[in-house]
Structure formats: structure tokens, C-alpha cells
Regions:
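N-terminal short leaders/motifs
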Residues: 57-76, 181-186, 193-206
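Conserved beta-sheet core of the metallophosphoesterase superfamily
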Residues: 101-113, 124-126, 131, 135-143, ...
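A broadly tuned preference for mixed-charge, low-complexity surface segments
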Residues: 63-69, 91-103, 140-143, 171-189, ...
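Short, surface-exposed linear patches
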Residues: 32-36, 65-68, 103-105, 147-151, ...
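Core catalytic region of metal-dependent phosphoesterases/phosphodiesterases
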Residues: 2-9, 13, 18-120
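Active-site-proximal loop/helix segment associated with metal-binding centers of metalloenzymes
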Residues: 128-190
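Hydrophobic/basic alpha-helical segments enriched in Actinobacteria
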Residues: 8-10, 15, 21, 27, ...
Length: 253
């Protein structure tokens, strides 16, 4: 298990949704990485870095810029760790018969499992993207299970890149339209699912993104206090988006 000592600060981010259609948000995030990335020895990016990711053969200028920044941080000694989200669940998934360089390798980063247990400043913790905890949304959970099956991924990644982009854009539009029809509570985490995940990991701290509802929640379960930290999404025109700094056992920014 990964253990991060109390004297080593950590930076967290998720849900940056990098896309050519959102240049201000991309600049906000990349500038934050360049400015703050060197100030902490650990950087965790917990999914949905990209609004759309259809394979590691994407020749995306934003992806190239991000990889250059992250590999630069890694060269300076920062431990960079990535996690897949619901938008970029195909990160590092190999295409049949291809020899693409995994995106995490281009970034000098380590790809994490979701969820990922660790000891953070002496506290048993769990990191997750967060979508697996939204168990009330049965339609999404069925899709999530399907698109993570190796056979489905191999079939999809065998398609030409242009076709994959077209399918991905269509799926994104359908998803956004569906969100407008769903009750807000349906797209939030389920409390029982949160407790079950934390029980399984023996964790008292959970850090996740996905819901775009930044907050810190505290409650008691099994006689112990638990904390759930929800990371912000990034949307520069709306004024949202900042790296969360964890220092001396608590969030300080």
C-alpha cells in the first residue's frame, strides 16, 4: 500500500474535462499545474482529465501539452499519479495489434486503480473518481459495467480513430441530454455505497470527484468519524477550478 508521510504535501485535482471547446478552462488548469505542481512531491489527478478520450493514439494538442507539463514535474521529482474517470476510461487501454505508448508513460505518471487505498499523513484513506459510488443511477451503472469489459473495449478500439471520435461525441451528447432529465440526487453518491467502499478499505477518509459538488462531509460510522472530500470540477468562465492542497493532515487550499 502507498504511504505518504505527514511531512510530504499532496495536490489533488479531478474533472478538468480538457477539450478544444473549452480553452479558458484548459489554460486555467495547465497554468495551475505549472505554478503549483513543483510545490508538492505528490500529485493525484483523479479522473475526467479529458472531456473525451477514445484511445491512446489520440493526437490531441491539449493532451500533448499536459503530458509535457506532467513529465516535466516527474523529472523534477514529483510523483504524478493518474486515475481513469467516466470520460477517459480508455486511458492506457491498449488497442488490438497496436503499439501505442500508454498515456501515463508519456506523462511520466503511474496509473492508479479505482478505488485506490493508501495511508495519507497517517490516516487510512481511499481515493476514487466517484462514479462507481453513484449507485442510484442504474442506467449509468449498467453502461459503466459494459464499457469496462475488455471485449467491448477491444471491439471499440479496433475501429478507425475518426469513427471512434464520432461515436464518442454522440455518446457525450446523449449523456449531457440525459443529465438534464435526471433528478440531481440520482447523480450524487449513495451514502450506503460510500460506507461500503470505506469499510472494504478500512478507510476513514475518502477523496473523490465526479459529482461536481465540492464539499467536505463528516459523519460517524462504526464508532469512528469519517470524512469525504469532494473535489471541484474546472470551469474557468464560471470561476471554478483549483488544485486541492493536503498538508499536515488536512486540506489547506
Amino acid at each position: 500500500m502507498l504511504r505518504i508521510p505527514r511531512d510530504e504535501p499532496v495536490l489533488f485535482a479531478s474533472d478538468t474535462h480538457l477539450a478544444p471547446e473549452a480553452p479558458e478552462t484548459a489554460e486555467r488548469f495547465l497554468a495551475a499545474l505549472e505554478r503549483e505542481g513543483p510545490t508538492a512531491p505528490h500529485l493525484f489527478l483523479l479522473g475526467d482529465l479529458f472531456e473525451l478520450w477514445v484511445g491512446d493514439d489520440c493526437a490531441d494538442p491539449l493532451a500533448a501539452r499536459l503530458a509535457a507539463i506532467l513529465s516535466g514535474l516527474a523529472a523534477r521529482g514529483v510523483a504524478v499519479r493518474l486515475m481513469r474517470g467516466n470520460r477517459d476510461f480508455l486511458l492506457d487501454v491498449p488497442r488490438p495489434g497496436a503499439w501505442d505508448v500508454p498515456y501515463s508513460a508519456r506523462c511520466g505518471a503511474t496509473l492508479l486503480d479505482d478505488p485506490c487505498p493508501l495511508e495519507l499523513h497517517g490516516v487510512p484513506a481511499l481515493l476514487a473518481h466517484g462514479d462507481a459510488l453513484c449507485t442510484d443511477d442504474l442506467v449509468y451503472q449498467q453502461w459503466r459495467a459494459t464499457c469496462r469489459e475488455p471485449a467491448w473495449q477491444a471491439t471499440f478500439l479496433a475501429r478507425p480513430l475518426a469513427e471512434r471520435f464520432a461515436i464518442g461525441r454522440g455518446a457525450r451528447e446523449t449523456s449531457e441530454a440525459g443529465k438534464r432529465e435526471k433528478p440531481g440526487a440520482l447523480m450524487d453518491v449513495n451514502a450506503a455505497a460510500v460506507d461500503a467502499a470505506m469499510d472494504a478499505a478500512d478507510a476513514t477518509l475518502l477523496v473523490h470527484g465526479h459529482t461536481h459538488r465540492p464539499a467536505t462531509h463528516r459523519w460517524r460510522a462504526g464508532g469512528a468519524e469519517r470524512t469525504r472530500v469532494v473535489l471541484t470540477d474546472w470551469d474557468a468562465p464560471a470561476g471554478r477550478g483549483a488544485l486541492l492542497r493536503w498538508e499536515d493532515g488536512r486540506a489547506v487550499a
